[in-house]
Amino acid sequence: MTRQDALQTLTDLISNQNLIKHHLACEVIMLALCKRLHLEADAVTLNKWGTVGLLHDADYELTKDEPKQHTLVLEQKIGSLLDSDVMYAIKAHNFERTGFAPKSQMDWAMYCCDELSGLIIAAALIHPDKNLVSLTPEFVMKRFGEKSFAQGATREQIALCEKELKIPLQEFIQVALSAMQKIAPDLGL
């Protein structure tokens, strides 16, 4: 699936603009992580990782009241259009409910960055400048340590980047933040 097709699929399935921004953030984080983990990532590999980020929650509005169906409905709708490893990574980011445990680096990258994108956006919104460009990894790390801040962002899920991807937490945050800063206008921040 091309990026254009994936973006069209996303906008066909998701109407909430904040959810679309979340997908865009996860897409650029996944692309950055792919480059970080695969120094010589080819176009096919980059497209797969980007597609996972861009479509991982594309059925959210259809399944928000049935979390066990999240990603499985998407598979029914477009699974035949995606490479099997892309669809698996999408399902694995909801593995606590679907039973499809993350196996590959792509699976784990999506699982870890999903929560981090929200934490970074929340940090930007409380920053004095209220934008991503002024945000630093240190500022995000400080918020990461505050359990009362952005309570919906599961820290344990983000921190698995160290065990499963062998990327230190601060570097993981830096990679994600730098990626998101590049598309800050698209994210409204």
Residue ranges of predicted features:
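Short coil/loop linkers at secondary-structure junctions
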Residues: 40, 81-84, 168
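Divalent metal-dependent catalytic cores for phosphoryl transfer on phosphate-bearing substrates
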Residues: 45-147, 159
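C-terminal binding/interaction regions
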Residues: 14, 139, 145-174, 178, ...
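Alpha-helical scaffold segments in soluble metabolic enzymes
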Residues: 9-12, 25-32, 73, 77, ...
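Conserved active-site and cofactor/substrate-binding residues in soluble primary-metabolism enzymes
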Residues: 1, 21-25, 69, 104, ...
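Acidic/His-rich, divalent-metal-binding segments that scaffold phosphate/diphosphate chemistry
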Residues: 1-65
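Alpha-helix initiation and N-capping motif
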Residues: 3-7, 48, 83, 137, ...
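Amphipathic, non-membrane alpha-helical segments in soluble helical-bundle scaffolds
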Residues: 16, 20, 106-109, 166, ...
